[in-house]
Amino acid sequence: MVEDDSEGDLCGHGTACASIIRSIAPECRLSSVRVLGAGFTGSGPALLEGLRWAVAKGYDVINLSLSTTKRDFAVVLHELADSAYFQRTMLIASAHNMPVESYPWRFASVLSVGSHQQDALDYFYNPTPPVEFFARGVDVEVGWLDGGRIRSTGNSLATPHMAGICALVLAKHPELTPFQLKSLLYLTASNVRGRR
């Protein structure tokens, strides 16, 4: 499934995520794959085809600020995530904003991200099962459609923060595998228990 992308971002979500990545890793090369339509609607086949295309391109980092609750797509998403992992592509996916079973963030081959806020009552935290990393995702100023700026909240906005960090690390250490990159991030994350 390939669509003409001359319309660009139809809902602002991709623009917001790209603006966060660019703010953290300004020298990185960004590519966009549209899998969401107007009104944040999307389809499983579009998600699978977009991810399949991105994995085949061999990008160093793939940001997936989305998830699906459709179990029908879990097996193929898992295969694509594993394929990315073994070809040394770091796939970074946001946890669902609600405590529901969703994919692909739950797979071990994916770096999973939730939003972090100092408030203990953070609504967007997904405690069961816990995500691997938390990044800023609450009241974040982001780029928007037509060159605008808005403030928004969600795990989708935390995920590109981690993607930007991964891009910076890989720019300095391109030899790192996804496993090594995850390990490095664990050792340096301020929200990991036992950090010195």
Regions found by a protein language model. Give the residues of each.
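An often Trp-containing, charged/polar helix-loop segment at the C-terminal end
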Residues: 175-196
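A cross-domain feature marking catalytic cores of carbohydrate-active enzymes
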Residues: 66, 93-95
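Predominant activation on well-ordered alpha-helical scaffold segments within soluble catalytic domains
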Residues: 18, 48, 163-167, 182
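Gly/Ser-rich catalytic serine loop of serine hydrolases
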Residues: 3-15, 96, 150-162
